[in-house]
Amino acid sequence: MTKADTIFKENIERILKEGVFSEQARPKYKDGTVANSKYVTGAFSEYDLSKGEFPITTLRPIAIKSAIKEVLWIYQDQSNSLEVLNDKYNVHYWNDWEVGDTGTIGERYGAVVKKHDIINKLLKQLETNPWNRRNIISLWDYQAFEETDGLLPCAFQTMFDVRRVDGEIYLDATLTQRSNDMLVAHHINAMQYVALQMMIAKHFGWKVGKFFYFINNLHIYDNQFEQAQELLRREPSNCQPRLVLNVPDGTNFFDIKAEDFELVDYDPVKPQLKFDLAI
């Protein structure tokens, strides 16, 4: 059993046994009913990517390529346009969060990255002094929230640090998330930010180090309890999945493509589970 599978099962059990039910929930299912959830607060996990520990479960298939494409949309294109996401990347799951008829998700995610020139500033800081302790991506922009409607960012802060070990520089990353759907989005969010970490490391020719993941509200929706029990019953695959970025060291951050990533030794348990998502 991989570390990710162990953490996955432990988190499911913790939510089912110790969790409390949400009140006055915002999300709704497609039929209009309120999407309540059972949740715990303060969930933390740690993976040493340099030792082959990756935050992806083998208990069900996880769509990695579309998750990586979303990261490129946010941090390379720096866009909130659904047309860009649909046409350039063939990713459509954000369409349910379109704001009115704007063709966008509001001033969120990529729009905030562009507004504050976040990626260029981050890369410049890391180039000038990798050991500075201010390498932070923050998507939490109150002014943007007041200017337009739109889903507030779930994965909203990423911090980066470097370590020199035996002459090699390792890039560590910490992802902070306000809210996370444990069964559906947990490993998607984790792996897409591992991909971002790998892109930045490649830009500088560094090694990937540790990935730290903190979630404030970790939940299972009230229509997912059957799937949760099924996941607990499943025996994990014997594979040891890892994400590989097949570009030379020093490749410019903005030149990396989704096709450059390869998920190696991934043979998840099937069949895939079905989930009715909360919007």
From Swiss-Prot:
One BP annotation, GO: dTTP biosynthetic process
Pfam families noted in UniProt: Thymidylat_synt
Location in or out of the cell: Cytoplasm
Top-level division of the source organism's lineage: Bacteria
Class of enzymatic activity (EC top level): transferase
Binding-site positions, (6R)-5,10-methylene-5,6,7,8-tetrahydrofolate: D181, A278
Recorded catalytic activity of this chain's protein: dUMP + (6R)-5,10-methylene-5,6,7,8-tetrahydrofolate = 7,8-dihydrofolate + dTMP
Residues annotated to bind dUMP: R133, R134, R178, S179, N180, D181, N189, H219, I220, Y221
Keyword annotations: Cytoplasm, Methyltransferase, Nucleotide biosynthesis, Transferase
EC identifiers of the protein: 2.1.1.45
Gene3D superfamilies listed in its UniProt record: Thymidylate synthase/dCMP hydroxymethylase domain
Molecular function (Gene Ontology), one example: thymidylate synthase activity
A GO cellular-component term linked to this record: cytosol
InterPro entries (alphabetical): Thymidate_synth/dCMP_Mease, Thymidate_synth/dCMP_Mease_dom, Thymidate_synth/dCMP_Mease_sf, Thymidylate_synthase, Thymidylate_synthase_AS
Active site: C154
Family the entry assigns: Belongs to the thymidylate synthase family. Bacterial-type ThyA subfamily.
Alphabetical list of NCBIfam families matching this protein: PRK01827.1-1 (NF002495)
Complexes and interactors: Homodimer.
PANTHER family: THYMIDYLATE SYNTHASE 1 (PTHR11548:SF1)
Record-given protein name: Thymidylate synthase
Native organism: Streptococcus pneumoniae serotype 4 (strain ATCC BAA-334 / TIGR4)
